[in-house]
């Protein structure tokens, strides 16, 4: 954390526990690297950028030291190492504090983007993205400890997936993004007292 900026890097290993991808009786190991850059633009506004990449231990590659790079732009490393070398996503987030009681937040994630397919207007599966819009209302209607939350989430089909199935965003058969994985729309309404 420095000034109004917070920067986080994480690296870890994951397991693909599907029987069809075992290697010598052991579950397949894959790795993930993440960057998250958050900036408090003002006392009310926070914006963030993030990226993540998953890769496998193909050809005894192991943990790829290229992904120790502390600077954002994993997509360039993924491109340099080959199409099936990894699965990268990028995204942005924002949070705005209207007052002490009301916050709005959003997030956008981009897995794959094809401008030609957007121009064609055919709703191509190649454009894989998701977004979230939400708001929280603390001490709602001046009732102490009453919190109300409304959130809309939408993720296009095949987001977080890859041509090489082992490069999907999952660990121990659980989605790492949303319980429903991809291809969904949901409205979440929460009230707590």
Task: Walk through the language-model features, giving the residues of each.
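Signature for the C-terminal beta-barrel architecture of outer-membrane proteins
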Residues: 2-191
């Amino acid at each position: 954390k420095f000034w109004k900026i917070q920067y986080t890097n994480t690296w870890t290993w994951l397991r693909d526990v599907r029987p069809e991808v075992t290697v010598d009786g052991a579950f397949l190991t894959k790795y993930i690297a993440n960057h998250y850059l958050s900036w408090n633009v003002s006392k009310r506004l926070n914006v963030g950028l993030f990226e993540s990449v998953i890769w496998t231990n193909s050809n005894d590659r192991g943990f790829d030291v290229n992904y120790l790079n502390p600077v954002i732009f994993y997509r360039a490393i993924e491109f340099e190492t080959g199409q099936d070398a990894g699965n990268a996503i990028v995204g942005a987030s924002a949070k705005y504090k209207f007052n002490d009681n009301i916050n709005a937040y959003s997030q956008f994630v981009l897995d794959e983007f094809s401008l030609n397919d957007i121009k064609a207007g055919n709703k191509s599966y190649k454009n894989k993205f998701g977004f979230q819009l939400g708001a929280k209302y603390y001490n709602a209607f001046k009732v102490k400890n009453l919190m109300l939350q409304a959130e809309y989430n939408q993720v296009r089909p095949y987001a977080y997936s890859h041509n090489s199935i082992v490069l999907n965003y999952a660990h121990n058969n659980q989605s790492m993004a949303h319980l429903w994985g991809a291809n969904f729309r949901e409205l979440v309404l929460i009230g707590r007292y």
